[in-house]
Amino acid sequence: MKGRKDTPTLRVNTNEALTFTYKKKTFSGFKGDTVASALFAGGIRMFSRSLKYHRPRGLYSLDGECSNTCMDVNGIPNVNTEKTLLQNGMHVTAQNVKGSPELDALGFLDSLDRLMPAGFYYRTMHKPARVWPIALQQVRKAAGLGKISPDFRMSGNFDEIFPSTDVCVIGGGPSGMAAAVAAAETGLRVILLEARPWLGGFFDYRQSNFSQGVPHYQRAQELEARLRALPYIRVFAHSAMVGAYSNNLFTAFQIGGENDPFDVRYLEIRAQSTVVATG
């Protein structure tokens, strides 16, 4: 295990070790790690290969905003490991590679990039006509990243709720928390959605001073304490909004924690008004 640095904003509990498998080897991480951070700390730098040219891909956004670290986790393809919390006994597999991300047999496609510009399949392989059905099968095989096993059976506890509220705040950073507090203090019912497992936004990890010697992360903690003390606010952390519709209808999916009775929960929220505070 490499690269662990103790900081006031660290959310990894180094006293609780977890193990998982990758490339038929056992790796270790800690509670609070994501799958990607545990792999990186274990020395893994290459997580996948790009769709078309099979170019190497590694950590980029560190917040689940890219597909570089999409992997197969416990038989489920295209799992974004940058935002998937590590659990004991996970089985992680690379996808879109022939071999491994480090030694991909299809890596030679990168040297053929000039022969495969954008949309090349619309202009080539159509003459003679009998060639296209054969080429189409190969293009289909090359498309996509993960593969769904026909033998896979989904397991777990799934839930759905349909709450209504006066104000729906999307984003649990400093602006979102401040907006939720301001609305709740007037007596309005508030629902707060945050995609990360915790609140704070970009204040959460900043140790520089906010004002009067108070660091940003401490300011975020103070805002969260005020927010959670108010009875009219419902907080849905680890809940990514996936749809916004007319009449202030919002849908989201929430990932359950170890103390929740569900693994994944579908949220369908009706709101009178909305505050978008996504940064």
Features from the language model and the residues they span:
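Residues forming the flavin
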Residues: 1-279
